[in-house]
Swiss-Prot record:
UniProt region (Required for nuclear localization), positions on chain: 1151-1175
Broad class of the protein's primary localization: host cell
Organism: Suid herpesvirus 1
Protein name, entry field: Major DNA-binding protein
Assembly information from the UniProt record: Homooligomers. Forms double-helical filaments necessary for the formation of replication compartments within the host nucleus. Interacts with the origin-binding protein. Interacts with the helicase primase complex; this interaction stimulates primer synthesis activity of the helicase-primase complex. Interacts with the DNA polymerase. Interacts with the alkaline exonuclease; this interaction increases its nuclease processivity.
One example GO MF annotation: zinc ion binding
Entry-linked Pfam families: Viral_DNA_bp (PF00747)
Length: 1175
């Protein structure tokens, strides 16, 4: 559904500013945590933040003076104004080294140039002929400022950054003025396009330094265009490099010229990329049709989709959005309360935390997101080629254009292959390059450099995050120990192309070695994309049943009922009321004895049952709602904002958002390519120029088709247009009486990407094709609910039993054990091996109540998640009761899990090797140097960690930065409707635990990685590809599945065997990441703490001895004494006490159902009721 049109007022402004700021005015302690800078280059990229890099009153959306038109017979000038917004980052080109580098890794520029040469992407050179450089020192001198005491950086409109790179702008010193940044006076010099001196020119000026250009009016005083070498090199790396890699265009200047032309000619719809675009040579699979023709069509689809993506990205760059640039004063993380929150990991005792430390703790959370996209083989960072599934056989009935023929694949390992022209002829200068065959390949430094667009600043920022990815701790391979690697390389004098002995700890190769457990690149196949995005709204439908019984579904047409009354009957409102009731009753919080525990179970049962009964009766009796039919229309939904300022925490997050946008736009364009190419003379010389507008219009027509939403924005111009007088020099004051017209008054602005996941799994209708039927059959086994006995600790009450085990069963500990152990107790109990003498009458009653509850819940459970809190249990129970009312059977539903990023101070020396700054004397000195870093933590020494929650709506309410898998399906509407609709399907990230330790491969579950923003940078407002992890995580998973009375001992032994001495540094968060169980993690941390208590110090030998002692403790010490019969427990007595009333048969005294269940229209009562024998 299209959004309502919006009217925005903007003021006329230049296309950019050069800020000259005193170095002392910069908050360098904060910039050091946000900037992207390489240690071997003074240029830097920093976020555009009001109060940090620009003044507090800076306006992010403007009407850029983009040129001039002649009007009237007298040849008067009218300025051409283009709506635009400023780029979310600023570019330091003078004294950028006043800010520390993002990473101390040496020679990153050398690494980028080496990878660029290997993969055939063009190197930087002066963008135009006869360029005259304007240095930062010269700018300072023109303003009368000391060059060595000031830093200069560019703030530029998003649509015109390529125009600045191509020297199509000039500095207007006459319009320079001062602003206040951080209480200091800073100068800013406006940048205007040279087109002011070339009326009616709506194209890129190829030779801006030619003062004799025929387009320049005779009476105009033409200025010197602005060219700065470090700035252009920076724009070449950060702006052009990622776009070139994403669009497979190896000539970066061609990308710049195309984007700059679109900035000046808003009506251009034809091709913007040149005809000499090259393509990667790789073997195409033999499918239907002629292979040669297929290769030509694949290459044409590749370049046309890239062209369309650049064209539509220009539309996004010229958009006017809702949010203004972030303001430093509005970041709660920097306020006093925010600092305590942000630094909670370090300030557990309530000690004050500096703003820099709080911000350092927060930005380290984002390391989990960046690492996920680096470690996931289906990440948008690696979508570097276009593949062809082959045209359908024309002899078959119904053969025609397909949405799925062309698609992007993750194939960075093919980038070094020879290159061809559009006809498939290999270029001579690349013919000697080896051709890599498709398949699995090792991930190398060059691939990471390519993913970063060969930009050393961006590479340094990504390394900043990878240095904070501590997931390598959980792999269980000794060869990834960074301390051992550095020590060994010092002894062996291992040669490295980037570092020497002194800089070996900080070397990028050291960081990648520590994280080398990343999966190999997957085979070339169609798969979902791993994308980055931002939740800009606190609203999402991520409850267990998604948007079931939503406001839109309940509202009747032409009904005047107040919206508030309708909202009260929705599923969302029912969940809110239930959670409020559970929280108000404090169920499970104050358990002090057996009676209190059993009362809590009864209270929970009654609360959930009453909520479900009230909800369903209201829908059926009052709303005449079709419960069962609506269930199959329910979806989990969320929206990712395309607002450029929402995800601009740092240059790396802006980069990830851009790569995601380019990947999505190309995915849409590729789906239409077959329809454009079908039956056309693709080999024709003018084919692209003729059909590129057709493809562009088709992609634009897909907006508001279910996936990418857009809205119409109407722009009005504020009074007063200030611009240079072209008849005077650039040092003269601007004129204030210009006339101006907006180039576009109303235009489409892209808003969001809508992501959804169907709640129900369906085997489909009879109209499915054979291939679709086979896919559904393969999925059915994964969704089939197994018919197995309920495991109490892994059931609905497992978390409560672990939490209150010491209170309820203080004698439930193994012989010789020091503390009650729920794993030992319930394992022996369910195996009928627990001595009956250890149990009292209260114990037995509680055990019977727990068993009945667990069995009753398991009989109706179709949510393939184990609750970890009372709120999760209440939500799952409510959803299961609703599913039972709808007569749902057989299959699990799709479930969501949110993995929230956290941060902590590191404890493992291997995690801090990259932060060692002093020279190492010898191999033995490596660990000492690492411990010195641990003992003296800095503001930026944090590492990322994770925590999971199944209450995803609360996670999404924090408006987080997110990473998730996304697949886009396309389909036509109803018969006779040719419009193409899409669905953004929630999918997975390939790599499993390599991506995040808490992720598992389960087709019934979808994960989202989230870094919260609310409370930090904004205020509160009203299937994988089958890759498996066979390291420590898989081993632990097997141990937990096998169970046993002392499962924590087996897990601890496995971890000790895999990690050795590093086990000493594991904290409760680390143990939780390994076992994904808060209470088991606490038991493992307690075992780890007992090691040092034995001999006064921790050692591997002492830990192994403790493990042997624990393994020697037998499950039962009673010899021949009678064991408690768990199977018979609960077979008699008050069975109805904990069974849901709707499940209790009438003969046992429950609520008697009516003779005919007309209320729910779901058949006769005997077919719905569970008998006592079934229970």
């Amino acid at each position: 559904m299209e959004a309502a049109a919006k009217t925005v007022t903007v003021r006329a402004a230049p296309l950019g500013y050069v800020y000259v700021t005193p170095i002392e005015a910069l908050r360098r302690d904060l910039l050091a945590l946000l900037v992207a800078r390489s240690a071997d280059d003074a240029a830097a990229v920093a976020p555009l933040v009001r109060g940090l890099t620009v003044e507090a009153g800076f306006a992010g959306h403007v009407a850029v003076v983009a040129g001039a038109r002649t009007t009237g017979l007298g040849g008067g000038l009218t300025l051409k104004l283009t709506p635009n917004h400023f780029h979310p980052n600023v570019f330091f080109f003078h004294n950028g080294d006043c800010v520390p580098p993002s990473s101390a890794a040496p020679a990153l520029s050398r690494a980028c140039e080496a990878a660029r040469a290997r993969f055939g992407f063009s190197a930087y050179r002066t963008p135009v002929d006869n360029a005259e450089e304007t240095t930062g020192a010269e700018v300072c001198a023109r303003l009368g400022l000391a060059a060595d005491a000031h830093a200069a950086y560019l703030v530029v409109a998003d649509g015109f950054k390529e125009a600045v790179y191509l020297c199509n702008a000039f500095l207007h010193y006459g319009g320079a003025g001062t602003v206040s940044i951080n209480g200091h006076e800073a100068w800013r010099v406006p940048l205007y396009p040279v087109h002011l001196f070339m009326p009616d020119v709506n194209r890129l000026v190829a030779d801006p330094f030619n003062a004799k250009n025929r387009s320049i009016s005779e009476e105009f005083v033409y200025p010197r265009p602005f060219f700065n070498g470090p700035l252009c090199r920076l724009l070449h790396g950060y702006v052009l490099g990622p776009a070139a890699v994403a669009t497979r265009v190896r000539n970066l200047d061609a990308v710049a010229r195309g984007a700059a032309h679109l900035a000046f000619d808003e009506n251009h719809e034809s091709a913007v990329l040149p005809a000499d675009v090259t393509f990667t040579l790789f073997e195409q699979r033999r499918r239907g049709g002629d292979a040669a023709a297929g290769g030509l069509e694949r290459r044409m689809a590749s370049v046309m989709s890239a062209d369309a993506a650049l064209s539509l990205e220009a539309l996004v760059a010229a958009g006017v959005y809702d949010e203004e640039p972030p303001a430093l004063d509005d970041w709660p993380v920097l306020s006093e309360a925010g600092a305590k929150d942000g630094g909670a990991a370090a300030a557990s005792a309530g000690a004050p935390v500096s703003q820099a430390a709080a911000l350092g703790a927060y930005v380290s959370r984002a390391a989990g997101l960046v690492g996920a996209l680096v470690f996931s083989s289906n990440s948008v960072l690696y979508l570097t080629e276009v593949d062809d599934a082959g045209a359908a056989d024309a002899r078959k009935e119904g053969a025609g254009p397909s949405f799925n023929r062309f698609y992007q694949v993750a194939a960075p390992y093919l980038a070094g292959n020879p290159q061809t022209d559009k006809d498939g002829r290999v270029l001579l200068h690349t013919a000697s390059q080896p051709a890599t065959a498709p398949g699995n390949h090792d991930f190398a430094m060059d691939h990471l450099v390519m993913a970063c667009g060969f930009c050393p600043q961006l590479l340094a920022r990504v390394l900043f995050y990878l240095e904070r990815c501590d997931a390598g701790t959980f792999v269980g391979r000794g060869d990834v120990d960074a301390v051992r690697y550095v020590a060994g390389s010092l002894d062996a004098e291992v040669p490295c192309s980037l570092c020497d002995r002194a800089s070996r700890p900080a070397c990028a190769h050291t960081t990648l070695h520590r994280l080398r457990h990343r999966s190999r690149a997957s085979a070339r196949r169609r798969s979902p994309m791993g994308v980055f995005g931002t939740m800009n709204s606190a609203y999402s439908d991520c409850d267990v049943l998604g948007n079931y019984a939503s406001y839109g579904a309940l509202k009747r047409p032409n009904d005047s009922e107040p919206p508030k009354a309708i909202m009260q009957d929705t599923y969302r409102a029912a969940v809110d009321r239930l959670l409020a009731d559970v929280a108000g009753a404090r169920i499970g919080e104050t358990v002090t004895d057996h009676a209190g525990f059993r009362h809590a179970l009864r209270a929970l049962r009654d609360t959930v049952e009453q909520a479900a009964d009230r909800f369903v009766r209201t829908l059926v009796e009052t709303r005449d709602f079709k419960l069962r039919d609506a269930l199959y229309d329910a979806n989990h939904t969320m929206s990712l904002s395309l607002d450029p300022y929402s995800g601009a925490l740092c240059p790396a997050t802006s980069f990830l958002a851009r790569r995601t946008l380019l990947a999505v736009l190309q995915d849409l364009a590729l789906s239409q390519c077959h329809g454009v190419l079908h039956g056309q003379p693709v080999e024709g010389r003018n084919f692209r120029n003729q059909f590129q507008p057709v493809l562009r219009r088709r992609v634009v027509d897909m907006l508001n088709g279910g996936f990418v939403t857009a809205k119409t924005v109407t722009v009005t111009l504020a009074d007063g247009i200030v611009a240079p007088d072209p008849t005077k020099g650039s040092a003269e004051p601007p004129a204030r009486d210009h006339d101006g017209d907006l180039a576009r008054v109303s235009f489409e602005v892209l808003r969001e990407l809508r992501v959804k996941s169907r709640v129900m799994f369906s085997t489909g209708s009879g109209s499915l094709s054979d291939a679709a039927r086979a896919r559904v059959a393969g999925l059915a086994g994964a969704y089939q609910r197994p018919d197995t006995a309920v495991d109490v600790l892994n059931g609905p009450l497992g978390f409560l039993l672990k939490q209150h085990h010491a209170t309820l069963f203080p004698r439930g500990k193994p012989p010789g054990g020091q503390s009650p152990n729920p794993q030992w107790f319930w394992t022996l109990l369910q195996r009928n091996q627990l001595p009956a003498r250890l149990l009292t009458k209260d114990d037995i009653e509680t055990i019977a109540a727990v068993k009945r509850f667990s069995v009753d819940y398991g009989a109706i459970n179709y949510v393939n998640l184990t609750p970890g809190t009372v709120a999760e249990l209440a939500q799952f129970y409510l959803a299961n009761l609703i599913l039972r009312y709808c007569d749902h059977k057989q299959f699990f539903i799709n479930s969501l899990t949110g993995i929230t990023m956290q941060s902590k101070r590191p404890r493992d020396p291997a995690a801090v090797m990259a932060w060692v700054r002093r020279p190492l004397a010898d191999a033995a000195d490596a660990e000492r140097a690492a411990r010195e870093v641990l003992d003296a933590p800095r503001d930026d020494t944090w590492v990322a960690t994770y925590t999971s929650s199944h209450l995803l709506r609360s996670v999404m309410a924090s408006r987080p930065l997110v990473v998730l898998g996304l697949g886009v399906s396309k389909y036509h509407g109803m018969a006779g409707n040719n419009r193409v609709f899409q669905a953004g399907n929630w999918s997975g990230l390939n790599g499993g635990k390599h991506v995040c330790p808490l992720m598992v491969f389960d087709r019934t579950r979808h994960f989202v990685l989230a870094c919260p923003r609310v409370g930090f940078t904004c205020s509160q407002t009203g299937g994988g590809a089958g890759l498996h992890d066979h390291s420590l995580g898989e081993h632990v998973k097997t141990i937990l599945a096998d169970g046993g009375p002392l499962v924590q001992t087996a897990v601890y032994a496995a971890v000790l065997h895999a990690l050795g001495a590093r086990t000493q540094h594991l904290e409760p968060d680390d143990w939780r990441a390994i076992v994904d169980d808060e209470f088991l993690a606490a038991a493992l941390a307690e075992i780890n703490g007992r090691v040092a208590d034995r001999d006064g110090r921790w050692s591997v030998e002492a830990a192994a001895e403790l493990v042997r002692d624990l393994e020697g403790q037998t499950g039962a010490d009673g010899g021949e004494e009678t064991a408690f019969d768990f199977g018979a427990c609960g077979a008699g007595g008050d069975v109805a006490g904990l069974a849901p009333a709707s499940l209790v048969p009438a003969e046992l005294g429950g609520k008697r159902p009516p003779p005919e269940d007309d209320l729910f229209d779901m058949g006769a009562p005997p077919e719905k009721r569970l008998t006592f024998d079934m229970l």
